[in-house]
Every structure is written in C-alpha cells, then in structure tokens.
Amino acid sequence: MIRSGYGKYAGLSKEEQDAEIERPGQHSTNWFDELFRNSVSQSHNLSLSGGSEKSTYYISLGYSKNNGLVKKSEYDRYSIASKIDIKPNKRVKMGLAADMGWQRSRGSSGSVDPFKYAYFANPYERPYNDDGSYSADRTYYSIRSANGGLDLPLPEVGFNLMREMDHTSLKDNNFNLTLIGNMSVNILENLSFEGLASFSYVTDNSDNFNGKDTYAAWQDRPFDDPFTSKRTYSNIMQSSTYNRSYNLRGQLHYFNTFNDIHYISTLLGSEIRGQYAKSIFTKRYGYDPVTGNSAIPIYPEDTSVDYEKLQRYASIVDGLSGQSIVEDKFASFYFSLDYVLLKRYILSFTARTDGSNNFGNDQQFNPTGSLGLAWNIDQEKFFEPLKKWMSSLSLRSSFGYTGNINKSVSPKLIMDYLGRLRQTDECSYRIGVIKNPPNPKLRWEKTRDWKLSLDAGFFNERLHFTGEFYNRRTTDAVSNVKVARTTGFSDQAYNTSTLENTGVEFSLTGTFLKTKDWRGTASANIAYNYNKLVDYNSSVSGLSTGVHKGYPLGSIFSGKVQGIDPQLGIYTYERRPDVSFETAADRNNYANYLFYLGTSNAPWNGGYSLSVGYKQLNLSLGGSYSINGKKINNIKSPVNYISVGSSSVETPPAQIYDLYVNHLNVRKDATERWTPTNPRTDANPRIIDAFGEFIGLKNYITSSETIANASMLENVSYCKLSSLSLSYGFNESLIKRWGLGSLAVSFTMNNIFTITNYSGIDPETPGAVYPLARQFTFGVAVGL
C-alpha cells in the first residue's frame, strides 16, 4: 500500500516511504496478551445431611464464579440440590430430589473471533493511540484497498477489536429445575415394584447488543446501502427459550435363589418420556441501552420510496421476530433376565423395543436385545492350585443390538420460512424453501455389537488385567448423498451407509506399594480401533470425497510429497502407477496423484495414572496419549488472493504458496523459502503472485489444493500429562480440637504439558488457534 502510493501515502518520496515502512517495525503488539488473561475461578459448596432410621435428608448449596479467558467475559452459577428418603415401613421406600440452578454469563458479542484475530492480526497494529483512544486497524479488513481495489467501507472510526469488546455485549441468564421422585414397594419377599417420575424445566434469556460505533453494528445495517451510506445505529437481539421434559418409568423386579445353586433375577418394565421446547426472538434496531427503548431507522427524508423499496422495508421488519417449536416423544418396553449357576456360569438376556416420533409411521418402533455369557473360572475346582499367584479369572462374551436416533433428519417435509412475506393488496403470504423432503421410510440406525473379554487378578488382586476384543457394525446409518436434480433436490440424507468398528483394548492396574504408611497404585490402558465404511450408496463416492468403501471415516486422500523442484520451486508428488502421463491435462489431473495417507481418527489411544500416598498426603497424576493420527496443519487465513477480487493470472495451489496471506501475520518460518536466486529445497516452496507473472504451473503439475495440502500433512501423535494433584487430609485427632469433623486441602494442575512432534499449537485440538488453557486449582474441604 505504501509503495503503491495509495490513499494517504500518495505523493510520498522514496525516503518518506522508507520511513513509513520502518515505523511499524518499531512497535510490536502481543495480541494474545491484549485480548486474553489468566482466568481466575472460584467454587464454594456447603452440604448438610442427617436423619434417622426411617428418613434421611441431604442439602447442598453451591456457588461458582469464573472470570473467562477472554477479557470482559465472566460466568456465575448458583445451585441448590436436595434429597429426602423416607422408609415408612418395611415394604415401602420413597425418595424425592430437587435440583435448581441459576447461571449468568457476560461477554462481548463475539462478532469477530478474538482467538482468530490474535493469531492473524499484524503485530505492528496498536490497540490504542498515544492519547488512549482506539487505534484503527489498518490491515485486517483492507486487503482490497491495499492492492488498489475497493473494500467494503469501514466505519468512520475504523475497526478496532478493543472497541468491539467494550461496546458489544452478550448477556445470558439460565434457570433450570429438576424434580425426581422414586418409589420401591416390596410386594412379596422376592417381588418388588420400582417406579420413577421426573420433570425438568429450563429457561434461557439472552441479550446480544452491538453499539452503534462498532464494526458489528456497521455490518448489520439492513436499512442502508453498505457502500454509500455512513449512517450507523445500534441493535439488540433478544431471545427467550424454555424447555420442559418428563420421564415416567415403572418396572417389576423378581429375584430368588433355588437350592443354593440357582440364582435368577428378572425385570419387566416400560418407560415414556418427552420434551417440548419453544424459542422466541426479536431484534430491534436503533436501540438505546440507557432507556431500553428503540427507534427503528427509516429512509432519509429526501429518499424516493417506491413500492419495491416499501416491500423491502416491510420484509426487513417481518424478519425481526419469530419463534420455533420442537416436540419429541418416546416410549420403551423392556425385559431382562439374569441367571447364575453355582456362582460360576452367568447368563444375561435383555429385550426391549423403543418408539419415537422421529421416524415414519411404520418405522417408529425398533426391537433390540442382547445375550451375554460369563464364566467365573476361579470358582472351578481345577483352579485351586493357581490361586497362590492368580486370585481371579473370568471370561465374558456378549452379543446384541442397539438403536440410535439421528436428530439431524426428519421423516416430515420441513420448510424454512424466509424473513419476508409476499405482499398483495389483500393478504400477506409466507415465503419459504423446502429444507428437508419427506421420507416416510426413515428408520432407526441399528448397531450389532459383540464382545469377548478376559479379566484376571494376580497376587491377591494387587495386579489386575482386563482385555477385550469387539466388533461393532452399524447398518442404516444416515448419510448425506447426492440425488438426481430432477427430484427437486441436489442431495438428501437417509439410511444408506454401513459402518464397522473392530478393536481391542487392554488395561492393567496394580498396587506396587502397600505398607502401614505408604501406598501406591498405577494403571495404564491402550486401545486400538479400526473403522471402515462397508457400504455407501452414492453416485459421488470416491477417493476425492474422503468417503470411500473399505476405508475409515476421516480418511485423508492427498498426494505423496517427493520434495521441492529446484527449478520451479514447487512441491512435486508421486504419480499413481495405474495412470498415464502423456499430456498437460494428465499432469494437471489431481486424481492421478491421489493416495490414501491415513486417518484423522488416531487408531491407537490410551491413558495412564499414578497415585502415591504417605499417611494423609497423596500425590496423583494422569494423562493420555494418541498414536498415528494425521492432520492437515493448515489454519486458514482470513485473507488470500481471492480476497483481492481480481482475475488471477496464476493460481496458487495452496495457501502456503499464496503471496496475499502475508497481508496479515504469518508464522516466522514463512520467510524461509525457495527463491530464483536461492533455490532451496529444504524450506517452504516459492511465493506465487496470483496477479503477477504467468508461470504455467498447470502444464507441469496439478494445481489442486487437495494434492498440494499434502505438504502440510502431519502426524499428531502425542503423550500428555493431563493432571497432577496433591492433597492432604488433616489428622482426625488434630481437627477435633478445632471442632471440625474433617479438613482437607488440595492443589491440582490440569493441561500441564504435551510431548509431540506436531508443529501446530495443540495436537489434542489440531487446527485450533489457541491451546487448551493450563489450569491451577486450590481446594479446601471442611466437614462439621
């Protein structure tokens, strides 16, 4: 912008331009420090309990406050939980529980993502001028004007994220109430009835306000031309939502032992549940935060208002309020049977059918069931000689079916009403588009599951091993597929896919230290899961879609990087052996370079924990690890060559080549590149100006981003120390002198450190622009 002599830089000499270019380098803003803070939270709980042989009670009061990670954000919550259990006679038990909570959150409206802004904003931009006023960011929304084009105008005061945080707000108030009643009646000695009834009510009210001088308000001016008008007005979006739900369950339970060797337990019951949710919203322009009133903007006095403009104005007003209603109902009937012979052989059988109004009329009920077998080998006589070192051994297997409801689809025709009406002299007609075509054959997703597991204990259970092998197959999974446009739709979601998961999991728990004063335990587990798409009926299924039969979900299909061409400065890729490369079209066809490179879902995962204690002092830690997950480490910049808005001469294959992403902040290693004068092959590829010199890359190699992204593919394996906790419980004889029943203090750290070769910010959340925050917690527990 400076060298081009554009705008306020017009007429500057080279020396003056040099001075202007050098000036920003004299200042560096750490935007993460400006926008974020060390969050301090506190939580307090007080509980009371007591009772007699026939009745007990429990009451808990809680308060928590969290000053958010983002400045100007905070969260408060008040809660009360109570429970009373009554036993009026030997046959009847009753209980009633009530939980209430009220929470309040405050923050900015979030019209601009502060995490993304902090990552990409240029460090030479300033949050404030020397006089304390807001300093306008000259680059974040100005890539077009910086390159001689025409940007959408900004407010006269410019864009400044600190102003957005100070003069926009999002206030949310939430109240929830849950009532639960249960009853158990011993009808006979071995027959009982168990019932449960619950009711929940949740209400949420939010106000989203944008001050008139903010960029958020500037972007939301439906009554004005965005290019010619400079008029601004504040706005507020207010919404109110409530949800009420219920659950009723009743079951008969019979159990008995015969001849001291047969034990049987059976359940027969049913359950109904449902929910009703309603949401109402309204938006007001010209809102005054002092009085709470609003004055809706009208066209300027000298504006010629024809019928078309009047219709547009009415359409805007019509869309300023609305409501939505959701209602769901479910019914279930179930039966279970457990049989134990000689405490060695166990059989479990379950059967149930569930019904939902989320499916077609003849598909609403889904029968499922399971069968399980277990053998307690350690109860056999031949096991006696082994008990000196193996204390327990059991073998279990199970087979069954379950059902799942995919709430993203509906059997009914769903219409999205637009925010305007078609007006006539006599009436107004709603206008909408069909979002979801009817599907009376929509049905449950069904999963067949079988498992085989082994449990073994050694040395009086000081060491315990569990191993499990499983196979899980889901049929009628809902997938979005392309359909013939003659149907009136380009795609539709219905029951079309079959998925399969196969895996093993091993866990080991041990007590390695056990004396009068010392104790120590450790555990670790590792799991391997392989999933694949067995069936997918779609005309567009293929490698390029990332959805292909025989491959895992989350598959990554891209190119195999061979290195940087020293002559051209671009990445070259391995060619598929089953295709020919005779023409430029062959060399540019991305499918000729496409390979399966792995999956974003790591096949190996696990965790570990360690606990060591000495008398009342205890130290524990825990963590997790993941092996061989893959991720394209490419955080999309808010700007690129397309943002300039001109016709390109040469298409950069991927963001890593694009000159115009350097308009905003980039990684330090972006300067390490191949250049014609320094043809490095151990750094980043060349910079490509989409509007500069024609290179003709597509004559040599594919320009597809799908292939070019392979250069940013990384392994996101990691090992993480997730938590570290130190606690101390004061000696009972000591605290009694203070009139206390118990006293303990604790200190906990979370998200401590991660070991990884991933070059991004956080391998646990790859692609994020801010890592999971490290947390420190100090706690005190007092009992009276």
Regions found by a protein language model. Name each.
Residues 219-231:
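Aromatic- and acidic-residue-enriched carbohydrate-binding clefts of CAZyme catalytic domains
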Residues 1-23, 273, 278-290, 494, ...:
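Conserved small-residue
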Residues 10-13, 42, 77, 83-92, ...:
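Extracellular/periplasmic, surface-exposed regions of secreted and cell-surface proteins
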Residues 34-35, 388, 613-704, 729-775, ...:
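C-terminal beta-signal and adjacent terminal beta-strands/loops
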Residues 33-108, 125-130, 136-137, 176-180:
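Transmembrane beta-barrel wall of Gram-negative outer-membrane proteins
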Residues 1-71, 109-112, 138-156, 160-170, ...:
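Residues embedded in well-ordered regular secondary structure
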Residues 65-69, 355-357, 512, 601-602, ...:
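A generic structural motif
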